[in-house]
Regions:
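Intracellular juxtamembrane helix-capping segments at the cytosolic ends
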Residues: 82-95
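Helix-to-loop junctions at the C-terminal end of transmembrane segments
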Residues: 29-41, 126-127
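A late C-terminal transmembrane helix in Major Facilitator Superfamily
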Residues: 94-129
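Cytoplasmic membrane-interface "Motif A"-like loop-to-helix N-cap segments
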Residues: 38-50
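Symmetry-related core transmembrane helices of the 12-TM Major Facilitator Superfamily/SLC fold
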Residues: 134-152
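Short amphipathic helix-loop junctions that connect adjacent transmembrane helices
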Residues: 1-13
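Paired small-residue
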Residues: 67-75
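C-terminal ends and interior cores of transmembrane alpha-helices
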Residues: 52-64
Length: 177
């Protein structure tokens, strides 16, 4: 993100502030999405946080700088913070716990590959077009598609299990004598 800001003439200090805001927003996104997932339908929670990211990317694509660019950074960070939480929660609801490890591992692997590809595409886009606008437009389009797909998810296939584990037995410690 810092490269996007400095490319647009933003000072190094403000670019560093944007990075700090992303970090703060990651925490808010992680905690906030986790809390909301306990009370609301997960695709709606994901739409809320990923919609914020889409808005932030669109603001950056529109060439916002100064305070709006800092707000855009925060919005992008919110979705970044919610990604793993919403992914794990929805996998458990739509694929169940029996296949959770496999499904989550595959999804997380794809998530990591997409993150690496995004960085490469951003760099390639800048090298080819001498601007971050084309890759940002592509990312905005991908986010809109993701939001549309999330809005089409139906009811959970697997509910919450309410199994209660028995209390642990006290451990007897020998005196060693």
């Amino acid at each position: 993100m810092s490269a996007i800001f400095t490319d647009r003439g933003v000072s190094a200090e403000q670019a560093a502030m944007a990075a700090s805001l992303i970090g703060a927003a990651l925490i808010v996104g992680r905690l906030g999405s986790g809390y909301l997932l306990d009370y609301f339908f997960a695709p709606r929670v994901a739409i809320l946080f990923y919609g914020a990211t889409t808005l932030g990317l669109a603001m950056l694509w529109a060439g916002r700088s100064g305070t709006p660019a800092l707000a855009a950074s925060f919005l992008v960070g919110l979705g970044m913070g919610a990604e793993v939480e919403t992914m794990g929660y929805m996998i458990s609801r739509y694929f169940g716990l029996r296949a959770f490890g496999t499904a989550f591992g595959l999804a997380f692997g794809a998530f990591m590959l997409a993150g690496a590809a995004g960085v490469l595409l951003m760099g390639e886009g800048y090298d080819r077009f001498h601007s971050y606008n084309v890759p940002l437009a592509g990312f905005c389009g991908a986010m809109v598609l993701a939001l549309l797909l999330l809005s089409r998810l139906g009811p959970y296939r697997y509910g919450v299990t309410r199994e209660v584990s028995p209390p642990l037995e006290p451990v007897q410690v020998s005196s060693g004598a």
